[in-house]
């Protein structure tokens, strides 16, 4: 039971960080140009109206793919491809 609670909290924190990045970019706040060391992938979130790109860890990519809404397309690229 403890492991389930810890896993849930880790997922919530990870998803919260990813959503924070999306919200920052959606609100027009300039994000850093370079990814952090742990962010080895570029996550692209495509919805009906917007396409958002940000750096993410492998775990964040997996979580976002699982938690995506219908109509959203999420892809993850290797390396720092967000600025391309």
UniProtKB/Swiss-Prot annotation:
Any single GO CC term annotated in Swiss-Prot or TrEMBL for this entry: extracellular region
Alphabetized InterPro entries for the sequence: Snake_toxin-like_sf (IPR045860)
Covalent S-S links between cysteines: 21-42, 35-55, 61-76, 77-82
Entry keyword set: Amphibian defense peptide, Disulfide bond, Secreted, Signal
One example of a Gene Ontology biological process annotation: defense response
Tissue expression notes: Expressed by the skin dorsal glands.
Main location as per UniProt: secreted
Superkingdom of origin organism: Eukaryota
Signal peptide feature range: 1-18
Subcellular localization(s) per the UniProt record: Secreted
Protein role: Lacks alpha-neurotoxic activity, has apparently no antibacterial activity, nor anti-coagulant potency.
Record's protein name: Xenoxin-1
């Amino acid at each position: 039971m403890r492991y389930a609670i810890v896993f849930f909290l880790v997922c919530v924190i990870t998803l919260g960080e990813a959503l924070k990045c999306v919200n920052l970019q959606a609100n027009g706040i300039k994000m850093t140009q370079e990814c952090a060391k742990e962010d080895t992938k570029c996550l692209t979130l495509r919805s009906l109206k917007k396409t958002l790109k940000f750096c993410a860890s492998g775990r964040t990519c997996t979580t976002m793919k699982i938690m995506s809404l219908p109509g959203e397309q999420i892809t993850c690229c290797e390396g720092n491809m967000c600025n391309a």
